[in-house]
Amino acid sequence: MSTVTRLNGLTRDPVPQPTTGAKKILVLNLMPNRAVTEQQFASIFAATGFPVTLTFCLPASHQIRRHADQLHAAYATFPEIEDQFFDGLIITGAPLDQKPFTDVDYWDELQEILTWRRTHVQGSLFLCWGAYAAGAVDGVFAGHSIPEKITGVFTVEGYTMPQSRYFLVPLAAIERGEIVAGNLDLGAVIVTDDTTQSTYVAGHFEYSANTLALEYYRDQAKNGDAAPEPQHYFTGDNQYSWTWRADAVAFYRRWLAKITDSQPPAAADTGTALPTIPLTSLAAARRAGLTPWQGANVDTLIYNLTPHTDRVWLLDTPAHHVDLANAWAILHHIQPDIQVIATKEGIV
């Protein structure tokens, strides 16, 4: 089992201690039961073999009806983290399939987040409604809502996962990218777009064994016999099993490995490895796709960069100490041929 550190959230670790080298994942958690969703992601990442640090986020513009104070105390909002860099972004599902996108109270902010992630995140993963919405904004596909719910556990081209949605992405609606899994009945289930390092998943690999059952019982209480029973899920004695767990772990393991092998977003997406403004060591390390090193005054490192990012000045003073060896390693990870000028105690 690998180490998963929850820096915030309703199930936050009491004393978070991130593992050196852990992948930094931002989760925009839009699911109704956020605590359960946090636990589901922690469980699946723990089984991947990759150390992971999770930060949970909410749209600032979302009007939360219940327990708003508790959620805002536990979660970051997008404006609070938008100056940070992450290895991965996950946008979860949300019970919004039957609502027009423009009726979602945080729709404008969600579009802003999707633009932001192209320069601040190495890889993005969109789930269920999150995939439906992101695919439309990104121009990867155009899905549509459907009157009958797709619910159950389905195996498509070797991938077994739960589906729970009121939308369909027809195979013919894919504008770019690759359909990894899909069929005529379920539509595109997994789509990847390498141009933005994005993966769109119509289902819920992260679901626990009982999640579909709980959703079904909830729908029964609301709609009675009209509630559709999940297909290929319940056994004859009304039990269920976690038939997708192995596929889920394998999927997330591959996703984390792909993030590890990819370039930092600033180098890959903007054509400029670093901006021409000073950065703290923390921001530079995140931009390089590395975990910031531990040490005193680590955030006082000053980077002065030329417009072409071919030279960097490191200033080390008694008041603001810089670990030059680690700074050098980070800079050469970003730009192997970069020229580094080090100034110590005011003397070049």
Which positions does each model-derived feature cover?
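Short glycine-/acidic-enriched loop or helix-start segments at secondary-structure transitions
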Residues: 37, 66, 100-101, 134-137, ...
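Short, mixed-charge low-complexity intrinsically disordered segments
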Residues: 333-347
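Amide-donor transfer/coupling interface in amidating biosynthetic enzymes
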Residues: 1-58, 75-81, 85, 112, ...
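Short glycine/proline-rich turn/loop motifs
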Residues: 71-72, 92-95, 236
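N-terminal beta-loop-helix "entrance" segment that forms/cooperates
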Residues: 60-72
